[in-house]
Amino acid sequence: MDVSTQRRIAAAVLDCGIDRVWVDPENLEKVKMAITKDDIRLLINDGIIVKKQEKGISSARKKEVQEQKRKGKRKGPGSRRGAKGARTPKKEKWMNTIRPLRTLLKELRENEKIERSSYRKLYRMAKGGAFRSRNHMKLYMKEHGILAE
């Protein structure tokens, strides 16, 4: 039985699309007799015409990916976009290298493990990029007999 007109009117009343209007198949005769918006409203109140739930977008896949990223996954070369300097800027990389070096030098100077002159020399070397890491600097100091144990 064709109730497309009633569905169209119901869609206007319910403020939704025609596809979201559900008509009870057992009461098609009643629906067929409805020709005004008021008739349709009565059928809606009786539960013969119902507005279907809107279909959403599942966020399950998104949550799964977020969980993996939180664990540090999905960071391989195939996932990387942009240049090396775009992912971690050169300045940030430099700051992450120089700050621990300067902190180490300061601690050694305050605890009098190194002399002021060698502190200044090492400070300038660090600024020049001579050391990759704290361990590299310590190795240099041991090899050159700067570090007083």
Swiss-Prot record:
- A Pfam family cross-referenced in the UniProt record is Ribosomal_L19e
Region (Disordered) residue ranges read: 55-93
Segments of skewed composition (Basic and acidic residues): 55-69
GO MF entries = large ribosomal subunit rRNA binding; structural constituent of ribosome
A GO cellular component term found in this entry reads:
cytosolic large ribosomal subunit
SUPFAM superfamilies documented for this protein: Ribosomal protein L19 (L19e)
GO biological processes:
translation
Q: Which UniProt keywords apply?
A: Ribonucleoprotein, Ribosomal protein, RNA-binding, rRNA-binding
Compositionally skewed regions (Basic residues) per UniProt:
70-88
Source organism's superkingdom? Archaea
| Known function | Binds to the 23S rRNA.
Q: How does it assemble?
A: Part of the 50S ribosomal subunit.
To which protein family does this belong?
Belongs to the eukaryotic ribosomal protein eL19 family.
Protein name (record): Large ribosomal subunit protein eL19
- Identify the species of origin: Methanococcus vannielii
